[in-house]
A protein has these predicted regions:
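Transmembrane helix-loop-helix
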Residues: 94-117
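Selected alpha-helical membrane-embedding segments in polytopic membrane proteins
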Residues: 1-70
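Hydrophobic alpha-helical transmembrane segments in multi-pass integral membrane proteins
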Residues: 21-26, 90-98, 145-159
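Helix-adjacent hinge/juxtasegments
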Residues: 64-96
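C-terminal ends of transmembrane helices
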Residues: 60-72, 119-131
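Terminal transmembrane helical module of multi-pass membrane proteins
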Residues: 123-159
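Cytoplasmic-side transmembrane-helix entry/capping segments in multi-pass membrane proteins
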Residues: 8-14, 74-84, 133-142
Length: 159
């Protein structure tokens, strides 16, 4: 198996922890007792979603850092700073859930913005010129964004 194939396989398998909690939360909201009944391993569904999302966004920030280190131009400095901003905002999302329900919704919005920002940042580097990888990133970001929008709408409906 090539590294490109492994990257694609792991990328799409990485959607499962986004989609499964989203499905369970939608099912609980539509057919159950609401999001409070959407437990995953005994944990509140939105918290599980946020935790995984924050970890993946931090990981992607690290990949952005690695891409920037391969370049010596001035944009590399901004990319490295942005990668740190992604990681810090993902960490903040893990803390925001303890403040108030509306801040939990805000944390999902912030994570969504992070994924869209990551895609934009990658579009500015050479990564967007790698056709197969870029197509995969677009699809993955589409599905991740859709899952975030679903979770946001489910949480807003319960406020």
């Amino acid at each position: 198996m090539t590294s490109a194939t492994l990257t694609r396989v792991l990328g799409f398998l990485g959607l499962v922890p986004f989609m499964l909690p989203s499905y369970l939360m939608a099912n609980a909201a539509l057919f159950g007792s609401g999001l409070q009944s959407a437990a995953i391993f005994g944990l509140y569904g939105p918290y599980v979603f946020i935790a995984y999302s924050a970890i993946i966004l931090s990981f992607l920030g690290g990949t952005l850092w690695a891409q920037a280190r391969q370049s010596d131009d001035s944009s590399a400095l901004m990319t490295i700073l942005f990668s740190n901003l992604l990681a810090l905002s993902a960490w903040a999302c893990l803390l925001l859930i303890y403040i108030a329900p509306i801040m939990t919704v805000f944390s999902v919005c912030l994570l969504l913005a992070g994924y869209l920002g990551m895609l934009f940042a990658e579009s500015l580097n050479d990564v967007s010129r790698q056709r197969k990888y870029w197509r995969m990133r677009l699809w993955l970001t589409f599905w991740v964004a859709l899952a975030h929008l679903l979770v946001i709408s489910l949480m807003m409906a319960e406020l």
